A protein has these predicted regions:
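Extracellular and organelle-lumenal recognition/adhesion modules and their flexible linkers in secreted
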Residues: 1-9, 13-298
Length: 298
């Protein structure tokens, strides 16, 4: 038996007739978001950088190669009056494109990446080898250029698997929520260790040498080394000088649908980030000795 809300197909409370216990379906349960710093609150390294990799917002890399001018990654404010702002998001991670005077090279790329420890997936409650068990990825994204963007989830353990996806067409300068519900697959493997088990990437641009026309979006497939995002994507953003791309509200949860974002306090989020990178209180001195990455593969 179950109790459902009016016009809802999901049970709010499920009752076990055998022992009389019940289970509540909580959309705001603590710890449901497997992403660390998905609201882009923490930026221990600084608020702006042209560094390749981790340079600004904690736990989110901005990786690039082949650029004529390096892109800038920056923690920025979410503007009041926007939908993400009304949902409690105050920060975003913004990529500002450099001036790519030689055009879109076939091996060029610029993309966001977040890594999750294998043990956090293997012990998440997701029955990842079952096609009837799901995780849902959701995030807010805004581009200064109207186009769609590619992304993927990629596993690390066993035979690496790739799940390519497309954001759908975005209107320029408009925040859009992207949601992807992803079934498990018998080929997935996540070891119980602290290595990077799952990579999540959102591509600003990937060249054609790094794509595969045979890739199928929205399904798991064996990862072909060097293939980043499945199918080709448009180069409009990349060939537009100073084009921008922003993300916030990134959430990955064990669910067959997206639920409300798990907002954590600044202190909670900082503590989670410090497992991977710690800035000493005297970090303003900019001494390399004040920075100590923790030994995990993620």
């Amino acid at each position: 038996n179950s109790i459902k809300g009016v016009n809802s197909s999901d049970a709010a409370i499920t009752i076990n007739n055998s022992d009389g216990t019940c289970t509540a379906n909580l959309s705001n349960r603590q710890g449901k978001n497997l992403i660390i710093n998905g609201a882009q609150l923490i930026a221990q390294r600084g608020t702006s950088s042209t560094t390749n990799g981790y340079g600004s917002v904690d736990r989110f890399q901005v990786n690039f190669s082949g650029t004529d001018e390096a892109p800038t990654q920056a923690q920025v404010d979410v503007a009041a009056g926007t939908t993400p702002y009304s949902l409690g998001f105050r920060k975003a991670l913004k990529i500002t494109n450099g001036n790519q005077t030689s055009g879109a090279g076939s091996s060029d790329y610029v993309y966001y990446q977040h890594k999750i420890e294998a043990q956090d997936i293997s012990q998440s409650g997701w029955n990842y080898i079952s096609s009837s068990s799901y995780i849902t990825l959701s995030f807010w994204i805004k581009s200064s250029v109207a186009q769609s963007f590619k992304g993927h989830l990629k596993t690390q353990d066993g035979t690496s698997q790739l799940y390519p996806f497309d954001t759908g067409s975005l209107s320029a300068d408009t925040w859009t929520k992207v949601t992807k519900t992803i079934a498990g697959n018998s080929n997935l493997q996540f070891d119980t260790n602290n290595e990077a088990g799952l990579h999540i990437a959102i591509m600003a641009f990937i060249g054609t040498d790094l794509t595969a026309s045979s890739a199928t979006e929205n399904t798991w497939q064996a990862y072909a080394g060097g293939i980043f995002g499945g199918k080709d994507n448009t180069s409009t953003w990349y060939t537009t000088n100073d084009a921008t791309l922003e993300i916030t509200g990134v959430q990955l949860e064990v669910s067959d649908h997206a639920t409300s974002f798990e907002h954590r306090s600044f202190g909670q989020e900082l503590a989670l980030c410090q497992r991977y990178f710690y800035m000493h209180a005297s970090g303003a001195e900019a001494s390399a000795n004040n920075r100590a990455p923790i030994a995990t593969g993620a």
